[in-house]
Amino acid sequence: MDKFNVIVVGGGHAGIEASLAAAKMGKKTLLITILAEQIGAASCNPAIGGLAKGHLVKEIDALGGQMGLTTDAVGIQFRVLNESKGPAVRGSRAQIDMDRYRVYMRNLLLNTPNLEISQEIATEILSANEQITGVKTHLGNVYETTKLIITTGTFLNGLIHVGFNKLKAGRVGELSSINLSQSLRNLGLEMGRLKTGTCPRIDAKTIDFSVLERQEGDAKPAAFSFRTQHFAPEQLPCYIAYTNETTHEIIRSNFDKAPLFTGQIEGIGPRYCPSIEDKINRFGDRDRHHLFIEPQTREASEYYINGFSTSLPYDVQVAMLRSVRGFENARIVRHGYAIEYDYVVPTELKHSLETKKVRGLYLAGQINGTTGYEEAAAQGLMAGINAALNLDAKDPLVLRRDEAYIGVLIDDLVTKGTKEPYRMFTSRAEYRLLLREDNAILRLGGYGRELGLIDDETHARIEQIRVNLAKGLEILNTREFTPSKQNLEFLAGLDEDVISEKVTLQKIVARKSFTSEKLRKLDAFFENLDEASLEQILTECKYSHYIAEQKNQIDKMKDMMSVKIPENFSFRGISGLSNEVVEKLEKFAPPTLFAASEISGITPAAIDILHIYIKMSQR
């Protein structure tokens, strides 16, 4: 019987980050996956990042994860979304060469010390006395471990739908994992059923690109990873097409063949990424819908039709596709489909992503009810880190809501749960002005270094930015700028409005029109600073009032977070708490007063009552 410190089941985006984190933290790690060639496969669109998702990738990178580095290495188009808006809601996004992404990740894992890969199907979770002891595979192999991380994506009891046709699979051409799903149920974990879908892939030579809108990458593309240097990718264009009334009529006339409407699909799909038939049904007043035409590889021989997710029959997919301008002769290489799969209700988890009922069992990714590569990778990284920390008898790394989008993601899952695929949005973060993409390295890089996932050179660069920021703000907040003739001429030379009274330099820099190039001319200290430091200084100046407000809110939140709810605390018998509130508190077992306040249905009045009783119990 082989023994490992950590075993990861599933080679998707969550499994990759979990495996790498555990192995790099010195733990003997095994990754079990159904098909080794598909490690790191992009099952849906060939892109990483986006609004809020880009934040997650930057945070993964700051903690020492891999997703951003690989994206930089194999990306074929890079854009910053919402660039004209404030820094809190900007999102980096990259089109990736999905084939090279897989090869890059697989080779990286194969060459990582302490990490082994085995192509098998995990069939049974082994435990004794509510403690993980190992895992069994379809080959009859038994691997012993005390830390098991399940990252199975859509493979748990996966069922693919195309029209009336159904196929048991975790992805087209790959087996689903049926026994493992039952094994999780046998452990007493509450489970549910979700649904997602994917779009058709089209032969490039059958598309008329001349009638499509061309969408280029940014002229000055920015890397995802702080560790990427000398970044100059060769970029490819994407394209935009539109559905029309003919397309919509074809879809409407085939609603009776749509598994989504016939009752064939039972799982709940993602609210914010609906299928094309769902869009036509819900938004019947719209005369067209955007379709984003995205290359799948650098060779651009196959294109993904983003916005065209469907589970309609194959012949209907062909008809509706060929009704779109530019696709009159299009040939489908890979059809779209819907897939149902089992998931574990995430309120079964602690904030460490360890299950409450079984010690040493961690869950990450779509098995927890999320959707998206980035959400999965973030959870995988945290599960791998916390499994390794637990082996060393150290406290888990639990990121707060004011520290990271990863903290928001996990806190939402474990305190509120989800009944539909959960995806990240900037609106979910109360303190999003503090959780920007640009400061992820400053927020989380220290953790990455402590864990041994960030090297000395990278850590030194991060700390230099921190020093530059402090020094720059000191200069701007303390030095005065008078309306002297020389200063007024200086402002005019920068194409800035003049001043009539003495102000600090910070007031000048806080102007919306003030750029990093202008900042370089303001004082000798800024002249040769790196762009990352300058951007930090500019943002802190421009949004200083709002940042201060959010920091005050955080201080109040920390006071509440510090009030811990004792283990095995009895909520019954507390006067003033309704039966509904008591049942929710018992079900979720929040560790702190703040965690209790995050549970849906727990009122501020209930929190006040609970606070009083906790203090009384501690006397």
UniProtKB/Swiss-Prot annotation:
Keywords, sorted A to Z: Cytoplasm, FAD, Flavoprotein, NAD, tRNA processing
GO biological process, one term: tRNA wobble uridine modification
Binding residue positions for FAD: G10, G11, G12, H13, A14, G15
The keyword GTP-binding is assigned to this record: no
Binding, NAD(+): 269-283
Gene Ontology MF annotations: flavin adenine dinucleotide binding
Broad class of the protein's primary localization: cytoplasm
Family annotation (SUPFAM superfamilies): FAD/NAD(P)-binding domain
Cofactor: FAD
Chain's role: NAD-binding protein involved in the addition of a carboxymethylaminomethyl (cmnm) group at the wobble position (U34) of certain tRNAs, forming tRNA-cmnm(5)s(2)U34.
Protein name, as recorded: tRNA uridine 5-carboxymethylaminomethyl modification enzyme MnmG
Biological source species: Campylobacter curvus (strain 525.92)
